[in-house]
Amino acid sequence: MDEQSTLRVGDRYQYAGFWSRVGAAVIDTVIICVLTYPILVAVYGWAYFDSDAVIQGGTDFVLSWLFPLIAVLSFWVYRQATPGKMAIRAKIVDANTGDKPSLRQYLIRYLGYIVATLPLGLGILWVAWDKRKQGWHDKLANTVVIGDKERTAEVAFSSNSDT
């Protein structure tokens, strides 16, 4: 990051940490499962979950591979975050400028999840040790995930919500 972006990001934002990102991923996974599993069970029956096949048919390909790709990329392009990241008030930004990433960066980031998960998830776990909290998918796409420093600032328990 250049000095100006570092100051801007450092003043208001912090890198989203490992556990908050795990929470965001759980939220996203639950949403995808709630939307796709009923259809998969209706089409393939409960035996779908017992199969060793990576793809069991056209419906499986669309719901298990294509739908998540389109949904995630759409949220990233239009909101810079999936519902899980929005829940933790985090967003994806270009690691150099702090601006919205390009579509190319988003595609690299999405495909980078494959690289990050193959060696026993080490590329995902990397977020826990990296000083900028980047997983391998972030490093490949040159992105970082940032969140508001004061995540509870909008929560108010009295009539005075300015404090």
Which positions does each model-derived feature cover?
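Short, small/hydrophobic-residue-rich motifs at membrane-helix boundaries and re-entrant hairpins
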Residues: 1-121, 139-142, 146-163
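Juxtamembrane helix-boundary/capping and inter-helix hinge elements in multi-pass membrane proteins
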Residues: 97-98, 131-133
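Glycine-rich flap/beta-hairpin and adjacent strands of clan AA aspartyl proteases
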Residues: 119-132
